[in-house]
Regions:
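Interdomain boundary/hinge elements
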Residues: 176, 228, 255-269, 358-360
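Conserved G1/Walker A P-loop phosphate-binding module
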Residues: 2-110, 115
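P-loop NTPase nucleotide-binding/switch module
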Residues: 2-31, 167-168, 172, 176, ...
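Conserved, well-folded catalytic cores of nucleic-acid-processing
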Residues: 51, 70-74, 104-111, 131, ...
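Conserved GTPase G-domain signal focused on the G5
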Residues: 40-41, 149-150, 154-158, 234-252, ...
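P-loop NTP-binding site
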Residues: 266-381
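Conserved nucleotide-binding/hydrolysis micro-motifs of P-loop NTPases
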Residues: 60-62, 84-87, 117-121, 146-150, ...
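Conserved C-terminal guanine-recognition region of P-loop GTPase G domains, centered on the G4
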Residues: 72-77, 96-228, 302-309
């Protein structure tokens, strides 16, 4: 069926306004922070952006979708993709979150593998490292987070352990990939073996490679255990936060900015509001409860009849749990806990939007929603 189009009125365009100019060596691209649950990815994202764009909690698996935070500098624009923690899934939700991370790896320019300074490297870290190098040709920067939680000797030991992890997993896997590539080249009659393009070269970043359908060779490293680099950071004390952003920016392609100046995230307001309500509900929640909480925004509109200089935004959300017993925990005696959740969330929403908010939270039960495909689809997973 033919569609009707409204012609563009060129008279409304200000063609005299000068276009913004950027240095020839300006860089712009995507960096994904990956790691185990509760590795400090969201806290670091917020610190680099300079504003809260991702909710944080000491509960593992707080992040449930990829969140983009945008870092603006004179020399570069870095779009940070904060991902859910990679873990051994126990539910369909867990499987979908891992799939979400896997899909992200091929769409960014550089990976930041977050490893807490205060936790020994374990099987989960080895698994993630092997997945990163096996499924992506992108440079991987090892970021040792939570440096403020250990002393200098303990931090030095963790940095050495991270370097050893790179030697054990990253370098070994890269060597195997190079062997396989050489074998494929021989089978093709020696036609391969040319230097593949990398995100370091202009016009040869991930987007260009995807258009060409190419898979480039493993990225060069600086000798630190197979990592592109290793750097410690404390997002809480803002120790080396800018240094991490500067380091990651070195691996994104030459490009003008991809987002307007001043834009700190491309997340819809409804998504941010739902996340702030969930964050408030996670505080003080019992051990089994955090994973059972999901939040959706059902309605959001300014109340009619309010004065223009004193608007009020009505926000209605549904907070889902999996069992009736959990519903009563969320509500609390006489609704006391729900009021605390609402007050905490409303204050954060008002600070984010810059307007007064009336927040209505309706608690519902969606039985075993984490393993129900239809429920997951309704909740946006």
């Amino acid at each position: 069926m033919d569609q009707e189009y409204t012609p563009l009125d060129l008279s409304t365009l200000d063609l005299s306004a000068p276009l913004p100019t950027y240095p020839k060596d300006f860089r712009s691209g995507f960096a994904s922070l990956v790691g185990r649950p509760n590795a400090g990815k969201s806290t670091l994202t917020n610190a680099m952006v300079g504003q809260k764009v991702a909710i944080t909690s000491n509960r593992p698996q707080t992040t449930r979708h990829t969140i983009r935070g945008i870092v603006h500098k004179d020399e570069y624009q870095l779009i940070l993709v904060d991902t859910p923690g990679i873990h051994r899934p126990r539910t369909l939700l867990g499987e979908r979150l891992n799939d979400l991370v896997a899909g992200t790896l091929s769409q960014v320019d550089v990976l930041g593998f977050c490893i807490p300074a205060n936790e020994k490297i374990g099987p989960g870290d080895r698994y993630i490292a092997s997945q990163l190098v096996a499924s992506s040709n992108k440079p991987v920067v090892a970021i040792v987070t939570k440096a403020d939680t250990v002393n200098s000797d303990e931090l030095r030991e963790q940095l050495l352990a991270v370097e050893a992890l790179g030697e054990e997993i990253m370098s070994a896997e890269r060597a195997q990939r190079e062997k396989r590539a050489a074998h494929r080249a021989q089978k093709k009659g020696g036609k391969g073996g040319k230097n593949a393009s990398t995100p370091f070269a202009k016009g040869s970043g991930p987007a260009a490679q995807r258009r060409a359908g190419e898979i480039s060779e493993p990225m060069p490293v600086d000798g630190k255990g197979g990592w592109a680099a290793i750097i410690p950071v404390s997002a809480i004390q803002h120790f080396q936060v800018e240094a991490v952003a500067d380091l990651l920016s070195q691996y994104v392609p030459l490009s003008p900015p991809l987002y307007p100046e001043g834009e700190l995230t491309d997340e819809p307001e409804a998504t941010l509001i739902a996340e702030l309500v969930r964050e408030a509900a996670l505080e003080g929640a019992r051990e089994e409860l955090p994973h059972s909480i999901a939040v959706t925004v059902e309605e959001m509109e300014f109340r009619e009849g309010r004065p223009a200089d004193n608007p009020l935004l009505d926000v209605h959300v549904n907070l889902y749990v999996e069992r009736e017993s959990q519903k009563y925990i969320i509500i609390g005696k006489g609704g006391s806990n729900l009021r605390k959740i609402g007050t905490k969330a409303r204050e954060q929403i008002e600070a984010m939007l810059g307007t007064r908010v009336y927040l209505n939270i309706h608690v519902k039960v969606a039985k075993e929603w984490q393993s129900d495909p239809r429920a997951l689809n309704r909740l946006g997973f």
